[in-house]
């Protein structure tokens, strides 16, 4: 008689999640999405001279436990204080350590085009590669939609970079649209197409490209037909948004019924998101139907405050899942 032994499901890790001040709202959402996440706190203070005065609460209680830190390197001024905590946590006799850095901010500065250029993406990767090991081994570094996938090779062997994507959140939202069967995906350039097209194979596609015309660089449709379609432009990040606006104009001129956009990282320096709000659009032809972003850049999300056409697709559930890897 053959005895079949049922395989027991793998027990989920209990995670103690620390977070920086600006990620508090996202951390609360991560904890709410899973009963395995337990929020911990840090006292973020400064001395009179401006340098950090930091204290990790419950340092003794987390010994032997799995620990994660949710970071946001939104400006150079906050990186030092967070790096100080990130380097301290693995030394508290914890079982494992995971750094969640939803947006890798120097990711677009990865190339040296002439002698003298400084590839700050490599610099930040080297700093993170120096994170001390915990009792469980190397630190896992979770990053969403890093600008160039080859940047995984910038990290040293003492950390384990884990690259996730926000595209499943977009796919879920697209399925909820009333015109879900009329969606076409557009890419603003070949780089975005190479990066994301394999995740979006179920949709017709349009690829745009910048071409030089005299002294100007203008956006043209390289391939695909947007006529009569709800076209969604997909890219990893947005800064000023100039390219997205030019793509929108070209797609509308070629007969797109509606144009929307998705980016994982809404950087928007100097409040450049205001160019996209419906109150600041010149006319209906210049408006995006939807502009989907994630909460990888918390300060931007707070500033936008759900003004149309913006909608926030939270990474919270995805982060909770990534912490179980």
UniProtKB/Swiss-Prot annotation:
GO biological process, one term: 5-phosphoribose 1-diphosphate biosynthetic process
EC number, as in UniProt: 2.7.6.1
Residues that hold Mg(2+) according to the record: 145, 147
Keyword Ion transport: no
Region spans: Binding of phosphoribosylpyrophosphate: 228-243
Cofactor binding, note field: Binds 1 Mg(2+) ion per subunit.
Top-level enzyme category: transferase
Keyword tags: ATP-binding, Kinase, Magnesium, Metal-binding, Nucleotide biosynthesis, Nucleotide-binding, Transferase
Superkingdom of this protein's organism: Eukaryota
Keyword Kinase in annotation: yes
Protein name: Ribose-phosphate pyrophosphokinase 4
Organism: Oryza sativa subsp. japonica (Rice)
